[in-house]
């Protein structure tokens, strides 16, 4: 079996149906003795250019291992599902299991934001006191 990386974009109005779509694709892959090595739901993101007059889409990334027939079934499912705006399938030489750069940067940004917010609150609390001391 070969390894593939698949990214598909879902219409933003259909974001609520993404978990069901993921589960449907998961059952197709695992039903044919395939494996999902990595599954990331990137959520709603801004598009680089409008697609069908839309400026946002819901992104999903999957790294899978499956045979050609299963891949054709998945791609057929993407093509005939009106909620899927675009899909891209890339053949990989080996399984990719570590988080993508987008997922890493998202978790790093959240971790960086939390301490920065605490520091700004402390600084904001110190400023009024220092102004009062300077005026006295």
Curated annotation (Swiss-Prot):
The keyword Repressor does not apply. The keyword DNA-binding does not apply. GO terms for molecular function: small ribosomal subunit rRNA binding; structural constituent of ribosome. Residues 96-136 are annotated as: Disordered. GO terms for biological process: translation. InterPro entries: Ribosomal_bS6 (IPR000529), Ribosomal_bS6_CS (IPR020815), Ribosomal_bS6_sf (IPR035980), Ribosomal_S6_plastid/chlpt (IPR020814), Transl_elong_EF1B/ribsomal_bS6 (IPR014717). Pfam families: Ribosomal_S6. Gene3D superfamilies: 3.30.70.60. Keywords: Ribonucleoprotein, Ribosomal protein, RNA-binding, rRNA-binding. GO terms for cellular component: cytosolic small ribosomal subunit. Binds together with bS18 to 16S ribosomal RNA. Belongs to the bacterial ribosomal protein bS6 family. This is Small ribosomal subunit protein bS6. It comes from Methylococcus capsulatus (strain ATCC 33009 / NCIMB 11132 / Bath). The gene is rpsF.
